Design a protein with these regions (language model features):
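Conserved donor-binding/catalytic core segment of Leloir-type glycosyltransferases
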Residues: 140-160, 166-171
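N-terminal strand-loop element at the rim of the active site
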Residues: 1-30, 184
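Acidic donor-binding loop of glycosyltransferase active sites
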Residues: 44, 208-214
């Protein structure tokens, strides 16, 4: 894949199951070396770190950076023994952060309860104009056309709820069309179209014609 000039490759990572998902982490001397080089060459006025609690590039950047820091928190969970044990080590570094952002109420509550701080709630931004334009371009539906339900997400993560959706569809007796977008294992389900990974343009086109987005 051709990457933009502003993207710096971090190197190999290994997967770790966490909170119903899979986190990919990089550890080792190369992480510290790359982070220091990135910060030095960038000469940033402000460094914005995502998930500073993650023991990889983010936490390393938090440890070595000297200038103003902003952090965005995405994760949430019910409990974490690892985070509890790491708290004495983490808190001094987290105190370097001048501005915190949480993308959801749960992420904010998790950060406040587990590690302190007072992040501002700012949900992830979505450029809706792309989808609004796709909606306008979508052909008008006739009164007898089936309702279209669209799912977008990773298929193999239980927390995304795909299997719950597929189970619920068995109880629907109306004429519907179901399109599933996302990477992972497709299921053999009658009346359900698994299209796999799609481009941004394809995603906008499919969402543009949807009646229900899950």
């Amino acid at each position: 894949t051709q990457l933009p000039d502003f993207v710096v490759k971090g190197g190999p990572a290994f997967p770790i199951a966490y909170n119903g998902s899979v986190a990919r982490l990089s550890v080792g001397p190369h992480v510290t070396r790359k982070v220091k080089q990135f910060i030095k060459e960038g000469d940033f006025d402000v460094l914005h770190i995502h998930e500073p609690n993650s023991p990889s590039f983010s936490m390393t950047a938090l440890a070595v950076a000297q200038g103003p820091l902003v952090a965005t928190y995405h994760a949430s969970a019910s409990s974490s023994l690892v985070l509890t044990l790491a708290k004495p080590f983490l808190v001094p570094f987290l105190e370097k952060i001048r501005g915190g952002i949480a993308v959801s109420d749960m992420a904010r509550r998790w950060q406040v309860e587990q590690l302190g701080g007072d992040p501002v709630l700012i949900p992830n931004g979505v450029d809706t104009s792309v989808y609004a334009q796709a909606r306008r371009r979508s052909p008008a539906k006739a009164s007898g056309d089936p309702l279209e339900v669209v799912f977008l997400g990773r298929l193999d993560e239980p927390r995304k709820g795909l299997d719950i959706l597929l189970s619920a569809l068995r109880q629907v007796h109306h004429d519907i069309r179901v399109t599933i977008m996302g990477g992972g294992r497709a299921r053999e389900v009658e009346g359900v179209d698994f299209v796999g990974r799609v481009s941004d343009a394809e995603k906008a086109e499919i969402l543009g014609r949807a009646d229900v987005y899950v």
